[in-house]
Design a protein with these regions (language model features):
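Conserved catalytic or regulatory cores that recognize and/or transform ribose-phosphate-containing ligands
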Residues: 1-83
Length: 83
């Protein structure tokens, strides 16, 4: 926690960009500090696919999870991806 605010990292497939934004907004209004993904490779952010970038972003996401008090999994229709 930071002061009285729970820190939550969002996890899930970047296919669901709109759902990430919806959940981020809701949790923020509930008084949480929300950490989310910075790019949505499956939703149009082509920079993700440059050599080395995807690996860096995956590692950064793990560090975001390390910083959080808890995670929130965005699981649209039960989809969890191929990994």
């Amino acid at each position: 926690m930071v002061k009285n605010y729970k820190v939550i990292t969002l996890c899930g497939s970047t296919r669901f960009k709109e759902q990430f934004f919806e959940v981020q907004k809701r949790l923020t209004l509930e008084g949480c500090i929300v950490i989310s993904v910075g790019l949505f490779g499956h939703s149009g952010d082509e920079e993700v696919w440059k050599p080395g970038t995807k690996e860096m972003l995956d590692d950064m996401h793990k560090r975001k999870i390390d910083m959080a008090d808890e995670i929130f999994v965005i699981n649209v229709g039960g989809y969890i991806g191929v990994r």
